[in-house]
């Protein structure tokens, strides 16, 4: 019979780092509230969580890489909002941020959740930060709780 590995939604004893961009902070703060809510509901306590605020989304991957390399975290959550404007800036930032966050996870082996909203409008961002479409910060935290437990099981 094969061995099955499944992550549990139990944050007890795990160490979490959260990187949140301050640009569009009215969205980032709602995402952070959602992530903290998920972690605390699933057994984490404040001592297990470090929140690092950075200027904007572009600074998130480098900060996450530094945190992942420290050995102090079982999982990371990256939060922020990039909202389309009238210039191509959105395309460059959203592309590099998503690639950068994926690279951190692959290069370090530390689970990293992508909770950076990339939306066409402010309304879409608001919907995904705790109104109609749920809270993507909460969802990102649930993802890393589960995958951190999968990794723990695989040791």
Curated annotation (Swiss-Prot):
The keyword Transferase applies. Gene3D superfamilies: Lumazine/riboflavin synthase (3.40.50.960). Pathway: Cofactor biosynthesis; riboflavin biosynthesis; riboflavin from 2-hydroxy-3-oxobutyl phosphate and 5-amino-6-(D-ribitylamino)uracil: step 1/2. The active site is at 89 (proton donor). It is an enzyme of class 2 (transferase). (2S)-2-hydroxy-3-oxobutyl phosphate binds at residues 86-87, 128. It comes from the Bacteria. GO terms for cellular component: cytosol; riboflavin synthase complex. GO terms for molecular function: 6,7-dimethyl-8-ribityllumazine synthase activity. Pfam families: DMRL_synthase (PF00885). It catalyses: (2S)-2-hydroxy-3-oxobutyl phosphate + 5-amino-6-(D-ribitylamino)uracil = 6,7-dimethyl-8-(1-D-ribityl)lumazine + phosphate + 2 H2O + H(+). HAMAP family: Lumazine_synth. PANTHER family: 6,7-DIMETHYL-8-RIBITYLLUMAZINE SYNTHASE, 6,7-DIMETHYL-8-RIBITYLLUMAZINE SYNTHASE DMRL SYNTHASE LUMAZINE SYNTHASE. Belongs to the DMRL synthase family. Catalyzes the formation of 6,7-dimethyl-8-ribityllumazine by condensation of 5-amino-6-(D-ribitylamino)uracil with 3,4-dihydroxy-2-butanone 4-phosphate. This is the penultimate step in the biosynthesis of riboflavin. This is 6,7-dimethyl-8-ribityllumazine synthase. It comes from Citrifermentans bemidjiense (strain ATCC BAA-1014 / DSM 16622 / JCM 12645 / Bem). The lineage of its organism: Bacteria, Pseudomonadati, Thermodesulfobacteriota, Desulfuromonadia, Geobacterales. The gene is ribH.
